[in-house]
Each structure stands twice: as structure tokens, then as C-alpha cells.
Amino acid sequence: MSYGLGTENQNLPGFVVLQAGGARVPHGGVGLFSNGYLPAENQGSIIVGDKQPAVLNIQPRETDAAQRSRLEFVKGLDTDFVKSIGGNNDVEAAVRNYETAYRMQSAVPKLCDLSGETEATKKMYGMDSPNGVTAAYGHQALLARRLVESGVRFVELSCLPEKMGGGQAPNPWDQHGNLKGGHENMARQVDQPIGGLLKDLKGRGLLKDTLGIWAGEFGR
């Protein structure tokens, strides 16, 4: 999608994978949201919305001027290298990723700052739930709405592991025992946040331009 349509926000990746509350990358690793055969800027970028920093190494370690100078130096080296070999999509994509990462330093903290959201909105997403995993998934869902508002093309939410019979922590829906209890726990985790997200998107006029997909790899 990001490859075909591009991004509407130059300060954020076109594909974001959200985590919160201890959600993990599923079995299969980051290859599950890789760019495949597309340029590198089309791979998913993980944002952990309830931690600081939300993206590893996102906080600048030097002044903006020094960082800009360093970035231009590296870009110059990479550009000269690409010219010397007659073009290389991977290197060109890396140069574009440098620029995106530079701009994300200011964009990501603003994205993750929920102080401007009303308590009613947070409650709608279940962020006040006594069930911690519901609250954490609701945190992701609220960030998903903010990303959609910001023009990010593709947003993926991550389910949280729960204690249940037969389920493996990184793949909490992949259960092999106590299915009724385990699936009830998982449904309780995601039901209110997903409902809140759809209601919020509709109320803001965003749902008409947004496709929501809730899916797993099988229906055990």
C-alpha cells in the first residue's frame, strides 16, 4: 500500500507496527512485516507507544546542526557510491530512511503524547480498564487513530500475551488447550479497544477512508 500510494506524512513511516504493555513480535520475527522485494522504506517500523523512547535510538545525542551535518556527509558518501555502481535500490532506500528517522525525532514524541486526548476518549478505548491487557491494547488502538489522522497508510496492532492453557506467549491466539477460557480472555482484551477505534474513526469522518482488518493465520 505504501509502495503504491506513497505516504501522506513525510515525518513518519508509511507502515507502523504498534506495541504496548509487553506485546511481542510474533513467531516468525520481524520478517512478518518486512518489505519483501520492495524498497526498504516499505517495511514496518515498530513503535512502542507506552515506553520512552517509543522507538529505539530515536532521541538525538547531539545538536541538530551537528546531526544534520553528519547526515549530509553520510548521504553524500552513499550517493557517490550509488553513482559509481550505476544505481542500487537498497542504498537509495537507506538514504531515504535516514531522512525519515531524522524527522521522526520530533514527530514520534508528539504522536505518543496523549495529554490532549479527553478522559472520555481514553475510556472509550478501554484505557481505564482494570484488565491491564485491555488498557494496553486500548493504548495501541488510540495511537492507531492518531497515526491514521497523521496520514500513515498502514497500521498494525499487536495482541498481548496472557496466561492460558496451551497458548504460546508471542502468538496468544495460537491455543491448543482450554480454548473457551483462553479465547474469552483474548476477546476481552481486544473487544472494547477495537469497538472504540471504529467508533472514534467514524465520529471523526475517517472510517469512510479507512479499511479495518481483524485477522489471524487460522481460526482454531
Language model features with spans:
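Ligand-binding pockets and gating/stacking loops
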Residues: M1-R220
